Amino acid sequence: MQVYLVGGAVRDHLLGIDIYDRDWVVVGATPEIMLSQGYTAVGKDFPVFLHPKTKEEHALARTERKSGAGYTGFECFFDQSVTLEEDLIRRDLTINAMAMDEDGNLYDPYGGQKDIDAKVLRHVSQAFVEDPLRVLRVARFAAKLAHLGFSVAEETMQLMRDMAESGELSTLTPERVWQEWHKSLSTSRPDVFLSVLRDCGALAVVLPEIDALFGVPQPEKWHPEIDTGIHTLMVAQQAAKLSDSLPVRFAAQVHDLGKGVTPESEWPSHKMHCHTGLKLIKKLCDRVRVPNEFRDLALMVCEQHSNIHRAAELKPQTIIKILNKFDVWRKAERLQDILICCQADHAGRKGLEDQPYPQAELFMRAYQAAASVDVQAIIKDGFKGPAIRDEQEKRRAEAVKVALGK
């Protein structure tokens, strides 16, 4: 029996980046042999075992045969005769189809190291087209490795286009779409995930609300990039620069969905997009099972980002109403997240990426002034029942007025 480190750990070792998970393949073993050596069986569909000491996953070498539609339609075959090369060829990309033995020797039958040197994401074999999830995985790897200069090989992109056109992507469950989208949000370039899916035609299938933004014009005076889809990619990139928060990055990507349903007769104006976008965000989040933490922030950013952009024009009472909607008195950190999204929106415009965004500081100053109002002082002054809340609102608005010099 021979044990090999495989997949992402080998790739990341060669790239010189941090390794978080290590997966192993075992050649020449059986389930009985693994159990006799103290491994614990955990795999349901195929034999995966946990190492008795490290608890890292060790899978028996296996082959796969397409037996039905979608990414679950596979039959697995494993026994002692399956070779390392046979196991590696079923993997998605050449850079993920390398192995290393316990002495550090590299096994690279499909040219993964060469593609790492060339910074190319290339499929291992034609079997790539059998698993629609691979389209999303390639887009995610493109986002993960974009900062190193990686791009998708043209022949791989063509296979992805063919898969998008075939209808096979419709077999992906909402949970798997969200799983890959969610993982892409933690990369250095989440926008690349969306742009690769757009380039191969998959975005229209899995995230049609975002795809609908491409080709929709905005006023050139405010948006030199004009195209709402391009703007969305730019905002996604800016949000990733400004924050590591995944809900912030998600909210930035969907904040303008309403522009995708503006009637053409109203273009390039989108006066109702902060309102129309709310329904689209709810529908999208329900469909791909987005967690409430992400959904709630996205809805608040969508509804209020235009108001925050014109913070200097708002009356103190209006600012208090907005802060109340955000529930900042109980969730103070939420305001910072919303302001970062708005700043990303402001910076996600061609040639205006470095323009200051004083609105964020203004809104934060207003919040701090309003938060300083002491409810106990209001009670001491003799206010009771609902009158306490009314007086609190008045004093908060007055505090904002003083702080902002209005």
Curated annotation (Swiss-Prot):
ATP binds at residues 8, 11, 91, 137, 140. Pfam families: HD (PF01966), PolyA_pol (PF01743), PolyA_pol_RNAbd (PF12627). Mg(2+) binds at residues 21, 23. Its cofactor is Mg(2+); Ni(2+). One of its GO terms (biological process) is RNA repair. InterPro entries: CCA_bact, HD/PDEase_dom, HD_domain, NT_sf, PolA_pol_head_dom, PolyA_RNA-bd, tRNA_CCA-adding_enzyme. PROSITE patterns: HD. Keywords: ATP-binding, Hydrolase, Magnesium, Metal-binding, Multifunctional enzyme, Nickel, Nucleotide-binding, Nucleotidyltransferase, RNA repair, RNA-binding, Transferase, tRNA processing. The keyword Nucleotide-binding applies. CTP binds at residues 8, 11, 91, 137, 140. Belongs to the tRNA nucleotidyltransferase/poly(A) polymerase family. Bacterial CCA-adding enzyme type 1 subfamily. A single active site specifically recognizes both ATP and CTP and is responsible for their addition. Catalyzes the addition and repair of the essential 3'-terminal CCA sequence in tRNAs without using a nucleic acid template. Adds these three nucleotides in the order of C, C, and A to the tRNA nucleotide-73, using CTP and ATP as substrates and producing inorganic pyrophosphate. tRNA 3'-terminal CCA addition is required both for tRNA processing and repair. Also involved in tRNA surveillance by mediating tandem CCA addition to generate a CCACCA at the 3' terminus of unstable tRNAs. While stable tRNAs receive only 3'-terminal CCA, unstable tRNAs are marked with CCACCA and rapidly degraded. Monomer. Can also form homodimers and oligomers. HAMAP family: CCA_bact_type1, CCA_bact_type2. This is Multifunctional CCA protein. It comes from Vibrio campbellii (strain ATCC BAA-1116). The lineage of its organism: Bacteria, Pseudomonadati, Pseudomonadota, Gammaproteobacteria, Vibrionales. The gene is cca.
